[in-house]
A protein has these predicted regions:
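Membrane-embedded alpha-helices of multi-pass transport/permease systems
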Residues: 27-31, 83-91, 108, 119-122, ...
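Interhelical loop and adjacent transmembrane-helix boundary motif
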Residues: 134, 139, 224-274
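Periplasmic/extracellular loop-to-transmembrane helix junction in inner-membrane transport proteins
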Residues: 2-9, 13, 34-78, 98-99, ...
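Transmembrane-helix boundary motif in ABC transporter permease subunits
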Residues: 3, 77-109, 130, 284-290
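Membrane-interfacial helix termini and adjacent extracytoplasmic/periplasmic loops
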Residues: 43-62, 120-158, 239
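C-terminal transmembrane helix and the adjacent membrane-cytosol boundary/short C-terminal tail
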Residues: 169-177, 184, 254-293
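Transmembrane alpha-helical segments of polytopic membrane transport and secretion proteins
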Residues: 1-19, 284-293
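Transmembrane alpha-helices
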Residues: 111, 164-168, 184, 190-228
Length: 293
């Protein structure tokens, strides 16, 4: 009996230490990125770095506004496309589809969610970019190469749809069947039950799923690097090229680091991305607590 108690205590202490180590690792990452960013922060005002649009490292101009705008445009467009599609797919597969259909869709979603991002990038380069250039852009502008915010948003949305559908399906499955049956027994239609019972009960989990998808979208590198155009400009529309922060880091780190402050500028870009993801997750936790109340 004493051995079992001791074993439980040791297991609890080990799990506690692992939890502390995980939190400490995040803190180390943040501190490390901040220290590496300190040279550029000591020479330029933070507000100027965030609001200037000129990116000319050779001339000592480090404006991060184009990269922040590009990241925001691609992420927002991807979520706007993926969220309604994923939600409707999950509702159909959970509430309406036959069990045999779900049997085949589940493995397919897992496969799509696990595909390397470079495959999505190649697909976007071969299909989405020419489609935007030849069929969409001519309706609104005189010329577009196709390497645009729209192409990046479409590719990113396709990447996160399998993830969102899988998460939504698991969340909907966890809603008690008793609640569904009680709603139906009171005369509600199936859609009314879904709208007023299932979706309302699943709201906290859905918020967490969207934040997870946002985090993946913000950190995506290879796919956006291949389809967004990588021009350091502030996009005026979805048919302009953009340069998200992950693409900036992947495209330039290891090159031109002899330029003064270039290494520090890229580390500051990484710190910005880290900060945005952390704030996003903390904000989602606050929203979840409010929703649960």
């Amino acid at each position: 009996m004493d051995y079992r108690i001791a074993k439980d205590k040791i297991a609890g202490q080990v799990m506690f230490l692992l939890t502390i180590a995980s939190i400490f690792l995040v803190i180390i990452m943040a501190v490390g990125l901040f220290i590496k960013s300190e040279p550029i922060l000591s020479q330029y005002h933070l507000w100027d770095l965030l609001t200037e649009s000129n990116w000319r490292p050779m001339e000592g101009k480090f404006g991060f506004l184009p990269f922040l705008a590009g990241t925001f445009w691609c992420t927002a467009l991807a979520i706007l496309i993926a969220l309604p599609i994923s939600l409707l797919m999950a509702i159909y597969l959970t509430e309406y589809a036959h069990r045999s259909i779900r049997k085949y869709v589940y493995p397919l979603l897992d496969i799509l969610a696990g595909l390397p991002s470079v495959i999505y990038g190649v697909w976007g380069t071969l299909l989405i970019v020419p489609w935007v250039s030849k069929h969409v852009a001519p309706l609104f502008v005189e010329f577009s190469s196709g390497y645009t915010v729209l192409a990046g948003g479409i590719v990113l949305s396709v990447m996160i749809i399998p993830l969102l559908v899988s998460l939504f399906m698991e969340i909907f499955d966890n809603v008690s069947k008793d609640l569904r049956e009680a709603s139906l027994s009171l005369g509600a239609t199936q859609w009314q039950t879904i709208k007023h019972v299932v979706l309302r009960k699943a709201r906290p989990g859905m918020i967490a799923a969207v934040v997870l998808a946002l985090s993946r979208t913000l950190g995506e590198t290879i796919a956006v690097l291949m389809v967004c155009g990588n021009l350091a400009i502030v996009p005026g529309s979805v048919l302009d090229a953009c340069y998200p922060i992950p693409a900036l880091i992947a495209n330039n780190y290891g090159e031109m680091l002899s330029v003064p402050l270039y290494d520090s500028a890229l580390m500051f870009a990484a710190f910005l991305l880290f900060f945005v993801v952390v704030i996003l997750n903390l904000g989602s936790r606050i929203v979840l607590l409010k929703v649960k109340e």
